[in-house]
Design a protein with these regions (language model features):
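Stable alpha-helical structural segments in soluble proteins, enriched in small hydrophobic residues
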Residues: 46-50, 85, 103, 190-198
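DPxDG-like acidic metal-binding loop motif
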Residues: 61-95
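SAM-dependent methyltransferases
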Residues: 1, 200-204, 215, 220-225
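A glycine- and small-aliphatic-rich helix-loop capping segment at beta-alpha/alpha-beta transitions
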Residues: 21-24, 76-84, 130-133
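Surface "functional belts" at beta-alpha junctions
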Residues: 23, 34, 89-185, 213, ...
Length: 225
């Protein structure tokens, strides 16, 4: 039976989840700016709770973004380091999809419009529909001014709004049926999405674990020309 380890540090929340012997264990903390200090201890604690060594993990999943640049880089760095050391593949999972999956789990909704506060007067935006329990992207993920967001062209029925970007609901050009602007990504939901990806053969080598920022001017140094 597959053992998967998932982690997410793309927002204020830091979380890890483990699938082992068909059982899911997880830890979740909202700890802005403390992800780098807490992530590895949380992983070690979860492995100890499951009674397994890190070497028992078959693959690692991580929140690829979009989100806070530093947080996304922490997740990529830790996953690549562990995956290289263990010679295990990785699965990159969208932060927006993870929030949609959490909304599906906690609120029982099948259509979710996710908005994360992207600063600079923009939001990270994506719309998702449930297919056999998996929240799948309808359209594209984008970074946009709130006034430019929209539902998929084939949209029908009611949509649930999730994510911190919905704190600016009066500016977002979509009217949802209900809203939870407090939802942050949880590794338990990232893990669920990663399981679907694993079953489809989407795992890649560690050096292919790349962040998705959606914004070009990220806070990383550029090589001189």
């Amino acid at each position: 039976m597959t053992t998967l380890l998932a982690l997410d540090t793309a927002t204020e929340a830091c979380s890890v989840a483990l699938l082992h012997d068909g059982r899911v264990l997880s830890q979740y903390e909202v700890i802005p700016r403390l992800h780098a200090q807490r992530l590895l201890p949380m992983i070690q604690s979860l492995l100890a709770e499951a009674g397994i060594a890190l070497s028992a993990v078959d693959a690692l999943a991580f929140g690829r973004g979009p989100g806070a640049f530093t947080g996304v880089r922490i997740a990529v760095g830790v996953v690549q380091g562990l995956a290289f050391a263990l010679e295990r593949p990785v699965l990159a999972v969208s932060t927006l999809a993870t929030i949609a999956q959490r909304a599906h789990r906690e609120h029982g909704v099948d259509q979710v419009a996710v908005a994360i506060d992207a600063r600079m007067d923009e939001v990270y935006w994506g719309c998702y529909r449930a297919q056999a329990g998996e929240m799948q992207l309808a359209g594209i993920e984008a970074v946009l001014p709130p006034e430019q967001v929209g539902l998929p062209r084939d949209s029908a029925g009611s949509w649930f709004a999730a994510g911190t970007g919905w704190r600016y609901a009066e500016r977002l050009a979509v009217t949802p049926a209900a809203t939870d602007a407090t939802l942050l990504p949880h590794a338990e939901d990232l893990l669920r999405l990663a399981v679907h990806g694993w079953q489809r053969g989407e795992a890649v080598d560690a050096d292919q674990a790349q962040p998705i920022y959606l914004r070009d001017n990220v806070a990383t140094p550029k090589a001189p020309r």
